C-alpha cells in the first residue's frame, strides 16, 4: 500500500500533514515547504505557459518569501505564474500523478449532541449544559455515548441498553440490537468530567473527517464554545492536532452565525453534503424528514418538547441521540457522499473540504494535469463581473400530446467545449458575425475554413487540444462509466420485476450477483426459480447499487457542467467571457438547428407542409410529437402495448437518430469544428395505454409537463413511469397528501381519461377533511421575520406564512419550545374567522407536531375549504385545462335536444 494524506495544513512556513503510511498507520509529519513559482523569460525553457511562452522556475526558501515575491511582481505589473495555493502544490509535489487510497483507514466521526434549556440553545452563547453526546467512529465501528446524569435540570438514572432493545409497548425504544451491540456507554456525574473525557476520545481517535447533521451550524460551535467556557481555551484547542481552532462570524440572508474550523480535521456537515449532492427537493431538510425519505425510517418519536424529554423520559432521550447519529450513517450507506468526497478529493489532489467548490476542484485538476506536461498555470486575474447569454428554451403550446419521443444531447456544454476546442489558449481571433437566425437556417456564410468556430464570432485552433477540453473529457468518461453501471442495475431491477409478474419459483437461497453488470438471459431464466421474497431482496440490492452509481454519475455531470459555469465566473483562474459566450451561443444554435432539421424530415415522412412537430424543448433536448406518424401507419396494426412502444423505439433508432446525426455533422462542418461530438440519442417514449382514453402527455408551460413513459433510454418499464416536471407535485411547498393526490390525478389524465379523473376528484374531496393536519399543511421558508414583526403582530404587507409564524410565536410564548428562525422551513395552515389565535393562519417548524398545548385548538379551527381550493383544486384545474378535460362533471343541456 502507498502512503496517502488525510489532512494538509500550513503552519508558518511549514506544511503539517496527517497521512496513512504503507502499513495503514496514521502518521504526522511537519515539512519545511520550499515552493516553486514561475516568471516569463526570453531564454528557451522546458517550462511553458498555456500560451506556449517560456517560463523560468523561481524556487523560494519559504512560503513567506514566495508570497512576498508575488506581491512585488504584482506591484511592478508582471505576472507571477504557478500554483499559489501551497497546500495543493505540496500534495502535487509529494504524491505525483495518482493517489491510491484505502477508505477503511480514513477515520470518519459522526456526532450529535443534546442540550436541555429553558429556551432553544444558542451555540454562540452555549449557556446550557451539554447533557448527551453520541460519537460514531468509522474505524472502530462503535457508538461512544457520553451521558450527563446530574445537571441543573435534575438527576437521571443510567440508560439501559436492554430496555432500549424492547418494543415501545413494553416501555422500550425499539433500538435494533445490531446498533446496541456497538454502543459504548459512559455515564458522568458532572459536565466537566464528561467534556474532558470527550476530548480524550478525540485525541486517541482523532477523525480525519468530522460529520453529522447541521454540525457546522450547531454541534461544533456549541461544543467549542461550551468547552472554552467550562475548561478554557487551551482545552478547546486540543480538538486540533496542531492546536489551532478558529472561528469567524459570517453574515447570510438570515443574519449572523459563528462558524468554527478545527485545523487538521475536515468538518463536512452532512446537511450541506446532502443539499449539494443529492439533487432532491424536500419540504424539509430536517434529519427526520431526510431519513424518512432515504431510509424509510424516521427519528425516535417522543411526547412533548425536546427540552422536557430528558426529565420525563431519559431512557428515550439517550436512545433518540444514538438513533440520530445512526440515521446519518444510514443515509450515507445509501447515498455514499463521504466516499464521493474522498474519491473527488484524491482525484483532484486537494483537501477534502475543497470539493464543495467546483472552482477550487477544477483549479486543482487542471494544475496537476498541466504540471505533468511542464506547463505553467496563469496567475489568478482580477475581473469585473459581466452577464452573458443563457440557453434557449422552446415555448410549448399548453395542450395534450399523445405520442411523444424525446431526444437528448449527451452532456451538451462539455461536448461543445470539446467539439469547438474552447480554451483560453486556443482562441485565434474573430470573424464577422451574422444574426443568429441565419446560422440556425444555415444561410450565413461559413465562418472559416482554417479555424473551429462558434456563432458568437470567436475562432479556435483546430489542431492542438485545449487544456479545458482535455480535462473535461477525462471526467466525462468517468461519468459515462458510472452511468453505464447505474443503467445496468436499473435494467436488472426491471427485469426481476417482470419475472415476479410472471410468477416466482420455490428456491429460497439467494444467488451470488456481480454488481454493475447487466444480467445475462441465462441468469434471468435461472432467477425464475427463486421465491418472490428472494427476488424482492435482489431488487432492493439493485436499486441501492443504482442509487450509489447515480450519485457518482450525477455529481460528475455537475462537475463537468460546472466547468462551463466557471469559465464565466470572475473568480476562476481561466475566466474568459468570450469562451462562456461561445458555449451558450453554440448551444442556442445547436438545439434550434436540430428542431429545423427534424421538422423538415417529418414533414417529408408524413406528407405535410410546415407542420411543427416540436412539442417542446430546452437547453439540450427536444420533445417530438409523432401523432402524425402513428396516424400514417395506423393504430390498429398494434395488438399489444409493447408493439406500439417497440415501433416508436425502432422509428427513433433506425430513422430519427441517423437523421439527427447527419444533421449535426453538417453543423460541425459548417462551423469547421475540431470533431463531431453533438450526439443526440432517443430518451423517452411516451404514449397512452392502447385502447384507453388517457392523453399520454401534456404541457402547461416551459419546463412544466407530464408524460406517460414506457421506455427511457432503452430501459423498458414493467409498468409505465410518470415523468412529471415543474408541476406542483415537484414543489416542496405542496402538502404531502396533495402531492400524492395530484400525482394520482396526473396518472389518470395520462392513462385513463376524464371520467377517471372526475371520479378520483369526488373521492378525494370527501377524504380530505379526515387527513392528518401535517400532510395537508403547506410548506414555506420563513425569511425576514423581524422585518414584518410589529410587536408580535403582522406589519405592513406581511406575507401569509410569516403571519403564521407570528401567530405561532404568540401562541407558544412561555412553553419553552424551539423558536422559528429566519431560513427555517415551516408548515402553514389557514384558520377560520373567529379563531382564538387572532389571525388568519398559523405556522410551525416543518416536520414536527404542533405543541400539544395548542394542538386541539388549531385542529378545530382549520379552514379546510380554503386550503383545499388553493393547494389542490387550483393546480388540478390548470392541468386538466391543458389536457383538454374537466376535473368535475359539468351539467349539460344536451338532454333538451334529444
Swiss-Prot record:
The record marks 618, 703 as: Optimization of metal coordination by the polymerase active site. Mg(2+) 2 binds at residues 219, 324. Its EC number is 2.7.7.7, 3.1.11.-. Coiled coil: none annotated. Changing residue 112 to A: Almost complete loss of exonuclease activity. Decreased replication fidelity. Signal peptide: none annotated. Mg(2+) 4 binds at residues 408-409, 620. Pfam families: DNA_pol_B, DNA_pol_B_exo1. The record marks 711 as: Essential for viral replication. Interacts with the polymerase clamp; this interaction constitutes the polymerase holoenzyme. Interacts with the helicase assembly factor. Part of the replicase complex that includes the DNA polymerase, the polymerase clamp, the clamp loader complex, the single-stranded DNA binding protein, the primase, the helicase and the helicase assembly factor. InterPro entries: DNA-dir_DNA_pol_B, DNA-dir_DNA_pol_B_CS, DNA-dir_DNA_pol_B_exonuc, DNA-dir_DNA_pol_B_multi_dom, DNA/RNA_pol_sf, DNA_pol_palm_dom_sf, DNA_pol_type-B, DPOL_T4. Residues 893-898 are annotated as: Interaction with the polymerase clamp. It comes from the Viruses. It comes from Enterobacteria phage T4. Belongs to the DNA polymerase type-B family. It catalyses: DNA(n) + a 2'-deoxyribonucleoside 5'-triphosphate = DNA(n+1) + diphosphate. Residues 245-261 are annotated as: Beta hairpin. This is DNA-directed DNA polymerase. Residues 377-898 are annotated as: Polymerase. PROSITE patterns: DNA_POLYMERASE_B. Substrate binds at residues 411-413, 479, 557. Mg(2+) 1 binds at residues 112, 114, 324. Mg(2+) 3 binds at residues 408, 620.
